[in-house]
Amino acid sequence: MLDDGSDLDRAREVARDADQVVVVVGYTYEDEGEYLISTENIKKSAEAGRLIGEKGTGGDREDLSLVKADRELIHALAGTNENLVVVYVGGSGIDMSDWDDKVPAILFAWYAGMEGGTALARVLYGDVNPSGKLPFAMAQDAADYPYFTPYTDNITYDYYHGYTLFDKNNIEVAYPFGFGMSYTSFGYDNLQVLTPQLDPDGTLLVEVDVSNVGDVAGEEVVQMYVGFANSAIDRPVKLLRAFEKVALQPGETRTVSLEVPVEELAWYNPEAREWQTETMSYAVYVGGSSAERDLLTGGFAVQ
């Protein structure tokens, strides 16, 4: 049964009697269109060989939360059915702090295109085991983000942003960068740094055992971060420097290899006008997200 959710009392009644409930909320191009120019002006720009600008349709969101009607619908349906999932349609992170602990499941569908409905159904019915990971961190509270306003004409993005800013300020987030769940679970063990001593022109080699400890076949994105705690300059706590996706059957364990050239750990020295590699001890973190609770830890040195 399809219901638009505008009548909250009716929506509750429908949800209580249903076998499963799918609550679709989120945004459209009118909310996140970034002032897209019209098709007509796209054609004119192509013919003229230059961009013909206009304000266009849609812009930036005015709030980090869902719109009021969506939030009210979620709160109204929370607790009505144990088989309820909130499906979020949108292109960026949202503040879910007032409702995420009140619903059994949340699925980010993003802007999935013409076959998005088919893809969503396949995930919900278990034909596909989701394996996506968040490309950003989501804070516990909107106040944890830098100052936000959709009305400014210009804005400055500092060196630290995203998960590196949260790490630097020691702020625990609600959903870390690289986080993502599936219908199974994965375990990490036996982290080995195969190149504990490296020259600046060397390559860091790491291996880790990854196991599917659930009952369903699935895919996991194994992530490797490098830490810079011993740096003589101001650097992030850690940065993602390699990742690998591995498919595992229930009970299966595989050894996953990750590598990163040392030159990719360099920093740009504006005074010398060159990239430089620090000779020091580095940390290695490997796991299923950027959250330190999910990471195995090792180390290596560049001489």
Please give the residue ranges for each predicted region.
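C-terminal non-catalytic regions of proteins with extracellular/luminal or membrane-system context
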Residues: M1-Q303
